[in-house]
């Protein structure tokens, strides 16, 4: 027929991702590039995602001046102005996170600190399409940092480190033993749940067959899920860990 389908390759959620322009229909098929929430560019359990290329693809789609955009998430977008606004804002979100991350890397700021500091400007952060359903700006920053600087977490001891359980056992001993750590975790879980989670992980790694430690870990991670707003992927990670903890506890209890 008379319609031309123009396929454009732009790494985004995957390395082989494509979007399609149909000029005669003033239409773009935008696949997973646009999502009606903060783009899922920060999944810590997947291969590399390409934040800068993702943003460029959104800009290129807007440049075709489509009247209809067909995403794989959410309903169709209609009207050139609406499409330009929504795709443009998401491009700005990704560009801002990438720029802040790369600037931080160039200034020698540790990757962990960059992820904790990255934030969107208020006008972008309050936009409905910035809802943190799957990823946070910090998650996306970690993806950008990995693309530019690899998997190392910048702690020299962890390039080729000790066994995690041995390290945890040493830290628990320095803390005064598992009972002392248990008391500290119980106190912290009511004031600083994130720190409590770090410590309960150490307790679990040091004593993975202690039913009391396993129950404490279950209680703390359940509290983390209940008391904070958590994006889906982060919540799934905690739920999967809870399943593991419960299986380990039940195996001990039923012996």
Where are these regions (language model features)?
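Metallo-beta-lactamase
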Residues: 4-107
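Accessory terminal helices/loops
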Residues: 63-68, 76-255
